[in-house]
Amino acid sequence: MIDIQRLYSLFKECSSVTTDSRAIAGGEMFFGLKGENFDGNEYALKALELGAKYAVVNEDSVAASSGDERVISVPDTLEALQALARHHRENTFVDGRRLTVIGLTGTNGKTTTKELITRVLSVRYNVTATKGNLNNDIGVPLSLLSINDATQLAVIEMGANHPDDIAKLVKVSEPDYGLITNVGRAHLLGFGSFEGVKRAKGQLYDYLAAHSGTAFVNTDDPDLTAMAADRWSFTVPAIPAVPLVPEPVEGVEGPVIRYGLSLFKAKVLPSSSEHPYLRMKMPGGLLVETHLAGAYNATNVVAAIAVGLHFGVSLEEAIDAVSTYIPKNNRSQMEKTERNVLIQDAYNANPSSMAAALDNLVLVKAERKGALLGDMRELGEESQTEHLKVLNQVLSMGLDLVCLVGEEFAKALAVRHSDSVKWFASSEDLTAWLKANPVSGMTILVKGSRGIQMEKTLPEL
């Protein structure tokens, strides 16, 4: 049994919380987490030597019997970390005020949308947000535990690979508001089917509906609209009546705030060599300029604007904030090298994000185009079908260069062979080929699942 009051009082003495003994700077509360291939309990005493104030360990670990008063024994360190985070989320302010938390999930665009929302809300508020994509059962509690007395709003990203992941994370984060960016065919190995994806992501809506929370819903998306309608009573008007203000619609148990390109009457402008990034025109002649590659990011931008408007950020302020966001970590980045223009989206890939990236490549104005694509992982029995769909799409585009990497694309090529496609077993093999066969004067999409590491090819482009 975890004595959460005692644990919380000790946490309040610490500078921060960490699960990485290598990150100890002094004064932290260290949690020794145990996974399939590691055991952080083994580093607990070392963490104390390095300056951690306390170390939380499993009660059956060697460190638990060390006799060091700074060692706190619990039945399960991960459960303790999550319980501490939930308690901190509920007791952030000594005067009893409740911190407003915005929860975010979705198949694609979670991290980009989270960063855009944070940038927009920071115009008016002190915002604590998930760092990077620390959105799992460890990252979410660590994000919550970084909240301090100065925090006015928290934006928490939640990821999922398995059916009940979101249900567990909302119990820790207890969001007051929620937004699902989209639902797509990803992690099918864990979810079983697209319906499984919708059920899993919809657990955010389930929590909000059960706790009188508020959902931001992109009503341009039929899947999200249907998922919201299953939980709240609201209708989508055929003709949007309010072009620039998200319209709250009282549901059975909580409000729904609608947004979308059509509701905002936002128009995505064509890209060009002079304007390669996403741009949108809003009513009244307002221009939204971004540093994001890909028209598919338009819904992420509109989501951030909608959230900002609801929390009192003006439209002009929101547009300015969006324009300052520069993506990183190979997410929707566009870079001009000495030889090529690169659309770097190599952080991850699934069927829906791959199709969207290829659709965007069609819209890009360029004389010569290419695509370097890596396998999409965790698709289970649907893998060959989904890779064949991507292969068919890319072959229909008439690209000047198509390079595919991985065993799943090899299986697709066995079904539909093409002499115009170059296949490689690994990103290292493709990198070696690019070094021996330099490519220049081309706009190139680089995308694949994280494990394929397509970013290794970038230095040769």
Give the residues covered by each predicted segment:
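Short, basic phosphate-binding NTP loop
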Residues: 2-103, 112-123, 145, 414, ...
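ATP-dependent carboxylate/acyl-activation modules
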Residues: 104, 110, 329-332, 451, ...
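Generic hydrophobic/aromatic pocket-lining and core-packing "Φ" positions
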Residues: 44, 166, 201, 205, ...
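Active-site beta-alpha connecting loops in nucleotide-dependent enzymes
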Residues: 33-38, 327-330, 346-419
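Non-catalytic positions within long, well-ordered alpha-helices that form the structural scaffold/packing
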Residues: 44, 48-49, 170-171, 362, ...
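Acidic, Mg2+-coordinating active-site environments of NTP-dependent enzymes
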Residues: 61-67, 97, 179-341, 366-367, ...
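Residue-level signal for inorganic ion chemistry
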Residues: 28, 47, 84, 104, ...
